[in-house]
């Protein structure tokens, strides 16, 4: 585990991808790129890039045989920039969905998003998240479901209208 008291104290890259366990291969592409740049943990005989990966299960979206691989992980490194990352259905967010409790037909698109804040002295703290939830996305201030499993009888209702969402917690209780 990555911990300040352990031998390896630095991460050289982080890989977020879809593809279930197959998507882990994308991290090896990032490792190859970083190795070529001379980055990595020095183990005397080589430098080993430390690239933790977080992978989403999204095989039910699109074709299950199309998934991230080492070449895509390498290409992602080549495409990296200092610009803000794309949000929505890009990268790891491509196949992300929310509200799957009633099946994929009632689910909604999830995605990827990021935020950052400068906390002073030039220190910038950032976060990136890929939302691929089985249940609902709930506004913590109001408790209102803002994305999730859609009721089968949606009809002409607008998103967020009463009856539009099937409350995952209620579905689980029944």
Question: Which residues does each PLM region occupy?
Answer:
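Active-site-adjacent structural elements in enzyme catalytic domains
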Residues: 32-34
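A structural signal for small-residue-enriched, beta-sheet-centric alpha/beta enzyme cores
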Residues: 1-21, 25, 36-174
